Amino acid sequence: MSLEKFVDALPFPPVLKAEGTRDGIPYYEVTMKQVMQKLHRDLPPTTVWGYNGLYPGPTFEVRRNEPILVKWKNELPFEHLLPVDRTIHGAEPDKPSVRTVVHLHEGRVSPENDGHPEAWFTRDFENVGPKFVHEVYFYPNCQRPATLWYHDHTLGITRLNVYAGLAGFYLLRDEEEEELNLPSGKFEIPLVIQDRSFYPNGEWFYPTQPGHEPPPAPQPPPAIDPTLPNPSIVPEFFGNTILVNGKVWPFLEVEPRKYRFRILNGSNARFYRISFSSPDLDFTLIGTEGGLLEKKIENVSQIILAPAERVDVIVDFSNHKGQNIILTNEANAPFPDGNPPSPDLSQIMQFRVKQKLSKPDKSKVPENLSCLERLDPGDAVTVRKNVLVESTDEFGRLKNLLNNLEWDQLPITETPYNGTIEIWELYNTTPDTHPIHLHLVTFQILSRATFSGDPNNNPVIGPPLPLDPSETGWKDTVRANPGEVSRIIARFGPFTGIYPWHCHILEHEDHEMMRSFENLDNQNFNPCIPIPGVCPDDSFTQCCQDIDDDESSSDEQDESSSD
């Protein structure tokens, strides 16, 4: 349905405040609720799921090396808001319809605090999944300051829970970054971009089977395919409406000065290629998922964002007084070779530049931003070859896999040792770009190249392809493009245990494009001993106390929180 653009102001999710402390650690309680929320001037209120009853959820603002405790509480209804496919692994008929678990995306945390897909829980913790450990999560924040986010990660229904509204920002800060004097306060704004579709009554539309289109789709709707489950998962979801921070095509009034925007692609499957409608306005890139770059990159005219990717940018509106400027999108769907965006989907939000400043702009964007260690491929102890493939399930539906294996097939095939550096090669034999996300670690992208032949039998590798500016820093999600091998390098640690790695197209993730890796104990590595060349704000030594204490702290908090 067509809604008028730029009639609603951009909302700002509120910053969470701790409930108090437990053993001196700030303690938060966040409750998932079903509420009605107004998403556009001309739409009736929409039923959404929100953390603390807000879509998107409230923002955590935390400090490096200052841990917090969070009790995630499920007070959602017993029946799901969206169509649940009971043939999908993890969502079988014997499982409760509504299950939740929260993943702190890019959090350097132990496995029991990671939000494992099978650590789900139901309302009031009445039922829990096989990997559930405790009610209170311990986040040590022993990592670089960065733009993290939190979202649902429940096996088999992640796509539905996130679509319903379960996502929010988690901003990690420190004094060194604040001393840079980047734009801050009301001039630092997180933006989460998502696509959705609506029924005329304001409710979310999500397809019940492949081929079902949102209103105003042709009437009558297509017949139910009797050869498929009903409801059935779809290969990917692409909405016909863009929301930013939970508002449909919003506007933001800005002053003629520098702003800092932390931009997250929070969509299920849609990619964005963002730029500005004014050709002389561009981005200064200062950070990616894993925090600030070593040096700023100026004059960036466009940025590609896959689902889960983030960028940290400065935009200077000083020379655009009185102008209305559109943040635009040129990405095809599916990416990269699908349909170009419609006129509606080529617009994201509007910036209305005022004539005057409220106060002088004293913020700066220094040339040098942070210490950034470059991992040396020569230090890698293993090069792992991973192949992305297309398959079909028992109903003939498209099913993408990692190494032709499903989520729970044993043995676990990726088994790095704690503290070691590995190179992972991602060979994509499918026609789509897949955003591949590894839990626990951040990594760097070494190279991309085309390949031909069998990836498992001496493929022919072409020359390296240029990386985008937004791929030069620490990452937690890499775009594995079709017909290419993407090479990433990571130091695994500091926690040991089992973590997921997966495609962050949520329909793919829910339909088996997810595997586990196990970070194994390494008797030759002590995370409390500094590694030469590692930047202080990224050192594993920040976490060494937490490695011993986090589980016991969380268990103690579970006991006290149930008093």
Q: Residue locations for each model-derived region?
A:
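Ser/Thr/Pro-rich low-complexity tandem-repeat tracts
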Residues: 552-554, 560-562
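Extracellular/periplasmic metallocenter environments
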Residues: 75-81, 89-178, 296-354, 430-434, ...
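Divalent metal-coordination and catalytic microenvironments
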Residues: 30, 70, 102, 152, ...
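N-terminal, post-signal-peptide metal-ligating segments of extracellular/periplasmic oxidoreductases
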Residues: 1-128, 134-136, 219-261, 266, ...
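C-terminal substrate/ligand-recognition segments
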Residues: 372-445, 450, 476-505
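Histidine- and aromatic-rich segments of cupredoxin/plastocyanin-like copper-binding domains
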Residues: 106-126, 197, 208-368
